[in-house]
Regions:
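C-terminal cap/substrate-recognition subdomain and adjoining C-terminal extension
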Residues: 1-77, 81-83, 160, 167-336
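Active-site neighborhood of HAD-like aspartate-dependent phosphohydrolases
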Residues: 60, 71-131
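Residue-level signal for pocket-adjacent positions within structured domains
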Residues: 89, 144-145, 215, 226
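A general boundary/transition motif marking the beginning of the first structured unit of a protein
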Residues: 91, 134, 146-150, 233, ...
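A metal-dependent, Asp-based hydrolase signature
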Residues: 99-100, 112-184
């Protein structure tokens, strides 16, 4: 049976699977206590990992490709506005495809886990892309499997491997247009954060390589530098992303009305709705419709045939956990 690609495609149609379609109707999820916890934990982690200005400046020296489109608002971003910042989703916004899938490839190559585990997570991602919504039972199953694989592994080990995997699989997948938008904010003296369901340490590697300020990502617990196999809250997805941005903005004394956010997914509408300058980047059908209805800015850096993204929860909520096996779920919640 052919494996799905990083974009969730395969040689056979997953819709032939026997499904119970009643639960597939999309539902907007409100913020829960766990999503608030996940957001606050991610914001705290992001602030800690971003407090290394010399390292960030060194990473920021990377050559940047000019923007592919002229900004629609020449006066934006506003130079010198210390209370403004920009928040970028990762998968299919900053980079093409699912970052965690590629981290998984790198760990599988290093015999970090078995082929059957890679196959299982790949099919889970494809399934959720086709389904177009989330099911608590399936998410819980993937979560437990992913966390069981990283349990007992050292954070430093997986961070080191993640650096190598970035060079092997991710560096060439960055959208130059989105990268230029991020650089415009940096050049204006603003801070720029990735906001992703990917593990926060994985996201931090990518942010550092791109010269960004830091990253908000899914937070997993570690004790003594070793993963415990538990998450702090829930994956940073949907409402949890909005909570993370809200918490970080409060801690950093940012004015969200002066901030910008960028995403490809309708699942990030809560985050996009928080800021004064929301942008739909390479948008899926639902986000494109919402953006047009609300007069949001759109950018599309895809060329040729546009990839149809049906079930973003796979790449974000569930895919982050599946890839979290691959890349190692991130940050440390130390216990006494």
């Amino acid at each position: 049976m052919p494996l799905p690609t990083p974009d969730g495609k395969s040689g056979r149609n997953p819709l032939r699977m026997r499904l119970s379609w009643e639960w597939l109707a999309p539902r907007r999820r409100p913020a829960t206590a766990r999503s608030v916890l996940a957001g606050e934990a991610s914001a705290e982690a992001a602030r800690k990992t971003s407090q290394a200005p010399e390292e960030a400046l060194e990473a920021g020296a990377t050559e940047v490709t000019p923007a592919e489109e002229k900004p629609a608002e020449p006066e934006f971003p506003v130079a010198g506005d210390e209370r403004a910042a920009a928040f970028f989703d990762l998968d299919n916004t900053v980079m093409q495809g699912a970052s965690l899938f590629h981290f998984g490839r790198g760990l599988y190559k290093r015999k970090f886990f078995e082929r059957r585990e890679l196959t299982r997570f790949a099919w889970q991602q494809a399934y959720f892309r086709i389904a177009g919504t989330e099911d608590a039972g399936h998410i819980q199953d993937v979560r437990e499997s992913a966390l069981s694989i990283v349990k007992g592994h050292r954070v430093a080990e997986l961070m080191s491997i993640g650096e190598e995997i970035y060079d092997e699989y991710l560096a060439g997948r960055i959208w130059s247009g989105t990268r230029a938008l991020a650089q415009a904010h940096l050049d204006a003296g603003q801070r720029v954060w990735l906001v992703t369901a990917a593990p926060v340490e994985t996201a931090t590697i990518i942010a550092r390589r791109l010269g960004l300020t830091g990253a908000l990502g899914t937070v997993a617990e570690s004790v003594g530098g070793v993963y415990t196999g538990r998450l702090v809250g829930e994956p940073l997805h949907g409402p949890a992303k909005a909570e993370a941005v809200r918490a970080l903005a409060a801690a950093e004394e940012l004015d969200l009305d002066r901030c910008a956010a960028y995403s490809d997914s309708h699942n990030d509408i809560p985050m996009l709705s928080l800021v004064g300058h929301p942008y739909a980047i390479n948008p899926d059908t639902k986000l494109r419709k919402h953006a047009r209805e609300h007069d949001w800015r759109l950018r599309d850096y895809r060329t040729g045939r546009k990839a149809v993204k049906i079930g973003i929860p796979a790449a974000a909520g569930v895919g982050a956990l599946a890839g979290g096996t691959a890349a190692a779920v991130a940050i440390h919640r130390r216990r006494a």
